[in-house]
Amino acid sequence: MNKAPILTHLLRSLICLVVAAPSGFGSEDSKFTSELFKDGTLVYSDDFNGGLNREFWGQPKGKTIEDGKLIVAPLFKSKEVAMKALKRDHHLGLEPVAHINRIPEKFVMHLRYKFEKPKLTPGRPSFQIGHHMINLGILESGGHRVKLPDGPSFSEPESEMALNKWIDLLVEYELGKIRVVVNGDGKTYEHEKATIMNPKDKLGPRFTFKGGPECKILFDSVRLWKCN
């Protein structure tokens, strides 16, 4: 019996499976793993193959879902047009802004995101873990910096975090302790200033992404666990 046609068919099937495989997380990534917690409950999982989850992302303005990616873009391209439309001179929607809401007091978050932007600009892009609280920024020479509110900063150049590249991020948090893993490079920080609680933020703990000028923010996978 000539087995060549069968082998050829099997090889073609395997190639099709590889090509069709999603670029984001697989089923294994929905399994709970943590260094800080023994167990957690998956409260949000999204690969952006459907509509926008407004419970976690809020208003759809400036947000589109294309090819399994959530894309966040500026609402306006010029200050004059924005001021005329909004009838104010602040919060003009000239940069992409995204919030992931309903963050538990103890959590594990795994997501993939990317800032598409020609270059770093002062204070941008900004990723806040807790609104105006813990800041995760990109170093100009590559890598990232964790800045605690009114506390110390920690630079981690080994993570290779950069603009225009997908960032694989894992964050584990409880009051006084946060673990940040970027592209497989991770550390745990214990400090009294490690908090996401902002008493001035009436919407509760959330993640805030701000891109600055000439920027789009892309997300392709999110997993959020509430921990005990």
Q: Model-derived features: where do they sit?
A:
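Bacterial N-terminal signal peptides
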Residues: 10-22
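Short, aromatic/His-centered strand-loop micro-motif at the edge of beta-sheets
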Residues: 148-170
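Extracellular carbohydrate-recognition regions
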Residues: 28-61
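Secretory/extracellular carbohydrate-interaction modules
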Residues: 76-148
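Extracellular glycan-recognition surfaces and repeat-rich motifs
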Residues: 52-82
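Flexible glycan-contacting loops in extracellular carbohydrate-active proteins
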Residues: 191-220
